[in-house]
């Protein structure tokens, strides 16, 4: 059970994080927030130390969670760095293109200083040739080189035992046939797991189940199976199914505990030993009322993976 913790939101309580196996700190960014358009750092300087929760660096919580056996991962990116959807004008990712070595060095320093277990790349921006980039000289090729190089070099640079690497792509971006899919597949050996967002895209598993359509235009299971079989050679433990609790009403993709539990139970019928679930966001997991039942359905603790 992997939980995204919005680091501007309240710090979680023990009854919230009891079920979590991983906590992803969202987000490390290279901007300062502004309501109309975020103020990008032109040199892609990443804010440090990265806040943990309540806009504060709570090293005590990171150390506590790790002492309990949880993995604490810092996520670089998020929607505020730039989104590929209509109406979004943030473009901070573009200032990072060509600065791969600096990005890797900065994230390595952050991981070491704050005792994180690794890095998540949360990239929801453009990567195709001909996409609507903002800055002169920005291209799909530069975006793809950035994603590939940062992924590869982080795995090689982060210290042993603190070098978990993952991505959390939007579901259409991780669809077989896209350039992003190809980058992820080429880096399969560098990815400890992948967290596709089944709430930002074509599928509506909370309403349609894994194999149906209706609310969504595509079914989730074929997408998931491509990741399992084509990208990760049949290892379903590498693919973590993504949910949004209540921030995604605009796309009709919220999943309550009953709906998400049903999806995970259904997924267990196809892949008895899978990568479990992740969700956005801790602030909406009131008292663990979402993560508790969904974790039970997902078999958190590995009960479904026993030989």
What spans do the regions from the language model cover?
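Chitinase-like catalytic core of GlcNAc-active glycosidases
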Residues: 1-261, 271-272, 287-296, 300-301
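Conserved short secondary-structure transition element at the edge of the structured enzyme core
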Residues: 264-267
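Residues that scaffold, gate, or flank divalent-cation-dependent active/transport sites
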Residues: 281
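Short, flexible active-site recognition loops that position polar ligands and cofactors
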Residues: 284
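Extracellular/luminal ectodomains of metazoan preproproteins built from arrays
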Residues: 306-307
């Amino acid at each position: 059970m992997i939980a995204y913790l919005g680091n501007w939101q309240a710090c979680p309580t023990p009854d919230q994080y009891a079920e979590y196996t991983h906590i992803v700190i969202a987000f490390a960014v290279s901007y300062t927030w502004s309501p109309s358009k975020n103020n990008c750092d032109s040199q892609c300087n990443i804010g440090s130390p990265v806040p943990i929760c309540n806009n504060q660096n709570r090293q005590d919580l990171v150390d506590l969670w790790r002492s309990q056996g949880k993995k604490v991962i810092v996520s670089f990116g998020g929607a505020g760095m730039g989104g590929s959807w209509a109406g979004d004008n943030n473009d901070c990712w573009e200032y990072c293109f060509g600065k791969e070595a600096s990005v890797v060095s900065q994230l390595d320093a952050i991981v070491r200083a704050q005792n994180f277990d690794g890095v998540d790349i949360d990239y929801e921006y453009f990567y195709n040739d001909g996409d609507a980039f903002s800055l002169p000289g920005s291209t799909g090729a530069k975006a793809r080189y950035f994603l590939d190089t940062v992924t590869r070099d982080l795995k090689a640079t982060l210290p042993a035992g603190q070098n978990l690497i993952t991505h959390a792509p939007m579901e259409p971006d991780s669809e077989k046939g896209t350039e992003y899919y190809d980058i992820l597949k080429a880096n399969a050996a560098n990815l400890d797991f992948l967290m596709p967002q089944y709430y930002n895209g074509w599928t509506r598993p909370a309403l349609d189940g894994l194999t149906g359509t209706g609310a969504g235009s595509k079914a989730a299971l074929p997408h998931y199976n491509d990741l399992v079989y084509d990208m990760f050679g049949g290892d379903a433990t590498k693919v973590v199914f993504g949910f949004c609790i209540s921030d995604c009403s605009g796309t009709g993709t919220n999943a309550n505990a009953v709906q998400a539990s049903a999806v995970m139970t259904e997924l267990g019928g196809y892949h008895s030993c899978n990568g479990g679930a992740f969700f956005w966001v801790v602030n909406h997991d009131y008292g663990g009322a979402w993560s508790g039942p969904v974790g039970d359905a997902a078999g958190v603790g590995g009960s479904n993976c026993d030989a």
